[in-house]
């Protein structure tokens, strides 16, 4: 993400609902939504035994590294990546060049079903983030600190 995005409660609730629904619809163990800076936005499913901070950071690093590889071969990016393990597999998808949707699943589901459900969830998330950007760019959406001057801060901390 080029700049920090302000998250409003309404959109945050919608994002969590999409992640919860994806967990159920794809029969996934865990779903994460991470921004490209490595900040965890949402998590759904069996997250108890996962270091979510590390997962978010490593996801962002992986997207950056794969973006570099994509450019080397003439691609803009690899919008979807799949990593298959013995017990668990991981599918990640870039959503609207802003965030990364990460799905961890086992053999109770198939890669095809997960990809299908991720495409649907990605479209929903793209719509939510577009609305969020418009809301943040709208009138009266500037920083709440923009009108505070250095004098105001000095006065606040003076006796």
What are these regions (language model features)?
Residues 2-28, 37, 41-159:
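Acidic, low-complexity cytosolic segments
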């Amino acid at each position: 993400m080029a700049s920090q995005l302000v998250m409003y409660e309404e959109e945050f609730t919608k994002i969590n609902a999409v992640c919860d629904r994806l967990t159920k619809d794809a029969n996934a163990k865990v779903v994460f939504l991470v921004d490209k800076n490595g900040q965890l936005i949402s998590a759904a499913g069996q997250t108890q035994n996962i270091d979510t901070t590390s997962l978010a950071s490593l996801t962002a690093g992986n997207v950056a590294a794969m973006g570099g590889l994509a450019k080397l071969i003439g691609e803009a990016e690899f919008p979807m990546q799949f990593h298959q393990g013995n017990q668990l597999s991981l599918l990640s998808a870039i959503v609207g060049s802003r965030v990364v949707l990460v799905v961890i699943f086992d053999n109770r589901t198939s890669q095809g079903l997960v990809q299908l459900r991720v495409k649907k969830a990605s479209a929903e998330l793209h719509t939510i983030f577009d609305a969020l950007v418009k809301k943040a760019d709208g009138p009266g959406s500037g920083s709440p600190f923009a009108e505070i001057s250095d004098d105001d801060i000095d006065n606040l901390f003076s006796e």
